[in-house]
Curated annotation (Swiss-Prot):
It comes from the Eukaryota. Belongs to the short-chain dehydrogenases/reductases (SDR) family. This is Probable tetrahydroxynaphthalene reductase MYCGRDRAFT_87994. It comes from Zymoseptoria tritici (strain CBS 115943 / IPO323) (Speckled leaf blotch fungus). It catalyses: scytalone + NADP(+) = naphthalene-1,3,6,8-tetrol + NADPH + H(+). NADP(+) binds at I26, D72, N99, R132, Y163, K167, I196, T198. Probable tetrahydroxynaphthalene reductase; part of the gene cluster 29 that mediates the biosynthesis dihydroxynaphthalene (DHN)-melanin, a bluish-green pigment and a structural component of the conidial wall. Catalyzes the NADPH-dependent reduction of 1,3,6,8-tetrahydroxynaphthalene (T4HN) into (+)-scytalone. One of its GO terms (molecular function) is tetrahydroxynaphthalene reductase activity.
């Protein structure tokens, strides 16, 4: 009786992945993790070329292949060029992770038109057109993975209407886009992180804590870890591992879904 050889379907060997906003934080963790799984990676950045190059260097130090490409995904023409350049460099594109985003807090009475537009330009409009261009450039059977937020699903957060709404729209995007992308067998999903300890973590986290502005960074950590029964704060790699799964063959039958990743946190 012939034995079927084992194939590690979690691997991404032969695939090319592009991660927007991957010079730092969750995006950097995604890029590094996808490379660790075998993918060649395009590290996108808007302004921080030094940070992006550090991610590329780390990937290469582990034996992977990566390139840093600049583009502001708030400008559709730059998004199109980013995808064109990725395909020109690596010859194909199989995975697009739409990670770029901005955060915003402000009471309803204080939110300006400029602030509203700034947030939706990247978090919502930007992600929509990243997905559009991904559809055009991805190989058959590709993956689009978008970035939501637990605030798009959770109870109301004070002074967070604009940001939460900009992320809530992503949930509708993935449900509809998954149908549109079916003709190319492309899956479309999103991850919705809770609080994740990135370089912006302490400043942002204080906004979720009553009187948080008076807490030290250590006190913020102690408070925030109580949100999860796991008694710890989320890390960028917690998100990257789920993205790696969705990007792999193992995640093929997950489509049109938003996966909350918050350690069962209750803010």
């Amino acid at each position: 009786m012939a034995v079927t050889p084992y194939v590690d379907t979690s691997r991404l060997d032969g695939k090319v992945a592009l991660v927007t906003g991957s010079g730092r934080g969750i995006g950097a963790a995604m890029a590094i993790h996808l490379a660790n799984r075998g993918a060649k990676v395009v590290v996108n950045y808007a302004n921080s070329v030094e940070a992006a190059n550090k991610v590329v260097d780390e990937i290469k130090s582990r034996g992977g292949e990566a390139i840093a490409l600049q583009a502001d995904v708030g400008e559709v023409s730059q998004t199109t060029k980013l995808m064109d350049d990725a395909v020109a460099h690596f010859g194909q594109l199989d995975i697009v992770c739409s990670n770029s985003g901005v955060v915003s807090f402000g009471h309803l009475k204080d939110v300006t038109e400029e602030e509203y537009d700034r947030v939706f330009r990247i978090n919502t409009r930007g992600q929509f057109f990243v997905a559009r261009e991904a559809y055009k450039h991805l190989s058959v059977g590709g993956r689009i993975i978008m970035m939501g937020s637990i605030t798009g699903q959770a109870k109301g957060v004070p002074k967070h209407a604009v940001y939460s709404a900009s992320k809530g729209a992503i949930e509708t995007f993935v449900r509809c886009m998954a149908i549109d992308c079916g003709d190319k067998k492309i899956t479309v999903n999103a991850v919705a992180p809770g609080g994740i300890k990135t370089d912006m973590y302490h400043a942002v986290c204080k906004e979720y804590i009553p009187n948080g502005e008076n807490l030290t960074d250590e006190e913020v950590d102690e408070y925030a870890k109580t949100w999860s029964p796991m008694d710890r704060v989320g890390q960028p790699m917690d998100i990257a591992k789920v993205v790696g799964f969705l990007a792999s063959e193992d995640g093929e039958w997950i489509n049109g879904k938003v996966i909350g990743i918050d350690g069962a946190a209750c803010m």
